[in-house]
Amino acid sequence: MPVSPPRAAAFEILLRIDATDAYASELLHSLRFSKLSSADRGLLTELVMGALRWRGVIDQAIAKHSAQPLGKFDREVLTALRLGAYQLLFLDRIPAHAAVNESVELVKQARKGSAAGMVNAILRKIAKGPRDRSDISHPDWLVDRWTQNYGSEIARKICDYNNTAPRQAVRISTIQSNVGTAAPGCPRAEGPIGKRIEANSEPNRAAVDGQPRAAVPTWSLDDLRADGICLVPGNLLRNALTVKSGDITHSEAFRERRLIIQDEASQLVALLVGKGKAFLDCCAAPGGKTRIIAEQNPDSTIMAMELHPHRAALLKKLVMSDNVRVIAADARQFPLDKKFDRVLVDAPCSGTGTLARNPEIKWRLKAEDILRLQGYQLEILAAAMNHVAPGGRLIYSTCSLEPEENERVIEKALAVNAEFRLVDCRDELRMLKERHELMIDNIESLLSGAHLRTIPGVHPTDGFFAAILEKK
């Protein structure tokens, strides 16, 4: 019996995620699966992300009907069970027999045929039983931590947000964008989107040094509508849009980097970097923040560092700007003796603010990882502080919700380096508001003391933290 392409692909991706440190978002967009039809790609994404988001509920259902502990299953068998159980518990449109039979076939094709009968029996019991989706599907230690740090109500909001597929945010590239009107049926041929895009289109921005800007290719929201893509205004930023429907990666605007996929909180962190002449981006891949810095500072020089050469190559491909130099280097051991006006440390972190997009993280992460990461973050931050010019600024950010990776890092860094002071992010957000970059009215909702903080479920974004340090 053949297995449908999306189920076979989902099985392969889930196996790789379980066996390695691979990320679902990267595997789903790999060339290996690029030839799937649009419908099959949609089902593939649903199967992979759903099975990861709801693994807690799925594993409870499997354990309820199995005499064998889950830890005793072969990886291939447990993956097939999880894939089948997700369809039975959450996808009403999938016939139960298809979910069961193809999961059994996956086990056979993985040369685990001796377990086929058991897989069949467990999934049929799940299919006949009640659908209990009440579990929050997060590790207890993580929920307990959020409850302690944010309270039970916000902890629940975080979990609920993480268990829902988030809408994709995109940013209008001010380097290349010259946008026409929206299509009928997709909001804003006239209105916020049209005004917002036209204001950011290169020909409509002020001339540089009295010289008109060069013409760039025009793209229209009509073009996106023709591809089945509908955009609505973002939630925080003038330059951000939200994908209401369709696949933006299939559009010419995306392929030509006129629209960049980037969460709004990530965009906001890059805007906090501000203006300058010489920039250092210490942990720059995948490059979204670097690109914003380059767009905001076209006459500056920017050095973008990335530890891993293959990620540095991807960074260079995304940024594609003459004023950006990409180097593969360890941010803890900066290879040049140079000072910068602005330094961005978007530190490697636990990623607990991005679990809606990266649900595999919550099943990999261990409590002890957070303190281990803190040590790494402190090393990077200490090295970066040595390269800030007098009067210059360092912006430290993570996509973590954990205080140990955020406030505690800043406190420890300032305790051993009296040359720096903490700058209140409130002032920077007000300036962004005055420049009509920031569209939200309640700036205070984005703050935790002097720091920027967004929380999934409280804000319609990933969870981010940022602090601004200024050298005296």
Where are these regions (language model features)?
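S-adenosylmethionine
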Residues: 1-180, 185, 191-192, 196-205, ...
